[in-house]
């Protein structure tokens, strides 16, 4: 599958007198239809990277290629039409008096016909389970509902790429998991490419690949399973250790023959059943 996003040796500084560049020769690609999670400590360059992809910042050197086109000042608006952004705080994203108005806002700015806008808004709200709230004021929604509306606003624009900048970080665990599953379903149904900046293990686990950033560089790229198998190193990368990984480590220390690496809860359950049956 071809790459829809590619960064080649991208360097960026916010200030000319910086001791270290914010991004230092960053190179990676994202395949069409892929879900890539980007993790790393604060200041590692995660948010700067996605702002370069969306054309909000311009690299000092290197190139950013989106959907086959080199991102330049002349085509930046064309590129942005292909990208939907959802940020951490949903309250900063609302501009409409009602949910319906808010989702329609971007479409109206593009000059889309009224009937098409109505159809797109209804479809987008249905995808995120918010069709019964379209007459509500955004201020009266819960945090999870607000983020669903923000995602609907992005999806209604029919982008090829959705970027989530810690979009689930302000939600409670239940709301976070529900939102992640909603995004996954939309991604699977419409073959959208998803990039998520996150510290959430559930979000990382649903990714196809994980890119780890450290000090403005790409530290590694791997599958979620390979990442979780790094054990205690995860703490240094800004992630918690998954519950199943902790259990596996504990069993191994006690001498039990459990497979090394990350296991889902179901896989761990199966291994424990096998161990018990041999006792």
UniProtKB/Swiss-Prot annotation:
Main location: membrane
Subunit structure of this chain's protein: Forms a stable energy-coupling factor (ECF) transporter complex composed of 2 membrane-embedded substrate-binding proteins (S component), 2 ATP-binding proteins (A component) and 2 transmembrane proteins (T component).
Pfam family, any one: ABC_tran
Keywords: ATP-binding, Cell membrane, Membrane, Nucleotide-binding, Translocase, Transport
Role noted for this protein: ATP-binding (A) component of a common energy-coupling factor (ECF) ABC-transporter complex. Unlike classic ABC transporters this ECF transporter provides the energy necessary to transport a number of different substrates.
SUPFAM superfamilies in the record: P-loop containing nucleoside triphosphate hydrolases
Annotated localization: Cell membrane
Family, as annotated: Belongs to the ABC transporter superfamily. Energy-coupling factor EcfA family.
GO CC annotations, alphabetized: ATP-binding cassette (ABC) transporter complex
InterPro entries, per the entry: AAA+_ATPase (IPR003593), ABC_transporter-like_ATP-bd (IPR003439), ABC_transporter-like_CS (IPR017871), ABC_transpr_CbiO/EcfA_su (IPR015856), ECF_ABC_transporter_ATP-bd (IPR050095), EcfA_1 (IPR030947), P-loop_NTPase (IPR027417)
EC number: 7.-.-.-
Entry GO MF terms: ATP binding; ATP hydrolysis activity; ATPase-coupled transmembrane transporter activity
PROSITE patterns hit by this protein: ABC_TRANSPORTER_1, ABC_TRANSPORTER_2, CBIO
Membrane topology annotation: Peripheral membrane protein
UniProt domain ABC transporter: residue ranges: 5-240
Protein name as annotated: Energy-coupling factor transporter ATP-binding protein EcfA1
Binding-site positions, ATP: 40-47
